[in-house]
A protein has these predicted regions:
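Short capping segments at the starts of secondary-structure elements
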Residues: 77-80, 146-152
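N-terminal, charged low-complexity regulatory/assembly segments
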Residues: 137-141, 153, 157-162, 181, ...
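Charge-enriched amphipathic alpha-helical scaffolds
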Residues: 89-97, 163-191
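Structured, charged N-terminal subsegments at the starts of enzyme catalytic cores
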Residues: 207-264
């Protein structure tokens, strides 16, 4: 059991305990200008300032389960829980400086709580979280069905059947922010500028992934309902499913056979 206690660190100090590469990734995702040799503290200062100015970024970055766990921890200060059950949530929340997990103790950053408590408890935020989870589940359902998808065509399908008001820019921003916490081994292509987003592994020749796609422009996808996409995603355990890297390998090996048209996502590099 892990006891929940207050951290003595400031919010900037908490953020700065993250690996430098994580701070650089987060800075890139939320549009912060930084230098390659910038220190952890300097990056943390810029991130804190950005999140204070734009707290709405937090609900776009963090999954609903992570924010619900954070609210639970705030209510349970001084009590204990089984930390192993919330490993993914703890990882996400530490990434943004809300807490750390040390020596079987969950340390809550009080400065972060003071600054973000009311915004994260609002009804509007709860609605945004539910909307984000809905969109995330649809995207994962598409991933499992098609193997690899293009973000632009993805947006068209979602607009036609599920989110008619969703714009391409909104979908791109959501994915760019949220994939920081998705499982690795996935690749996302932006058809508008041919940019590939990767997380933890690189592809020797990125173009090979899309050769068949380019040659066979007549290829198309069967359309499904929102519930079918979401049920498939949930059936595969979206958040903690270990099969995403295996799916990635399978798609890469079979792309030559025209069995799959290309997305795949990942979370560290662009």
């Amino acid at each position: 059991m892990a006891r929940i206690e207050e951290s003595k660190r400031t919010y900037i100090e908490e953020l700065a305990t993250n690996p430098r590469v994580n701070l650089m990734v987060l800075s890139e995702r939320i549009d912060i200008v930084f230098h390659e040799d910038e220190s952890e503290v300097s990056l943390a200062e810029k991130i804190a300032e950005k999140l204070y100015d734009m707290p709405q970024l937090i609900t776009k970055l963090l999954q609903q389960e992570a924010i619900e766990f954070l609210l639970q921890c705030w209510d349970m200060e001084g009590e204990s829980l089984i930390a192993e059950m919330y490993a993914r949530e703890i990882e996400q929340l530490h990434f943004l400086g809300f807490l750390s997990y040390e020596d079987d103790t969950i340390l809550l950053n009080i400065e972060a709580k003071d600054n973000f408590f009311f915004s994260l408890k609002s009804r509007r935020v709860q609605e945004e979280l539910e909307e984000g989870t809905r969109l995330e589940n649809i995207l994962f359902g598409m991933l499992f069905l098609y193997g690899i998808l293009d973000i632009y065509e993805c947006c068209q399908m979602i607009q036609e059947e599920m989110f008619p008001e969703l714009t391409y820019d909104e979908l791109e921003e959501f994915i760019l922010l949220r994939i920081v916490f998705w499982q690795s081994g996935i690749l996302l292509r932006n058809q508008m500028n041919s940019r590939l987003l990767l997380a933890s592994r690189e592809v020797e020749n990125r173009n090979e992934v899309f050769i068949q796609w380019s040659l066979r422009e007549d290829l198309s996808w069967k359309r499904y309902s929102e519930d079918e996409y979401k049920n498939l995603a949930l059936g595969n355990g979206i958040g903690g499913w270990d099969g995403i890297p295996e799916l990635y390998d399978f798609v890469m090996k079979n792309i030559e056979n025209d069995q799959y048209k290309a997305v795949s996502y990942t979370h560290l590099r662009a």
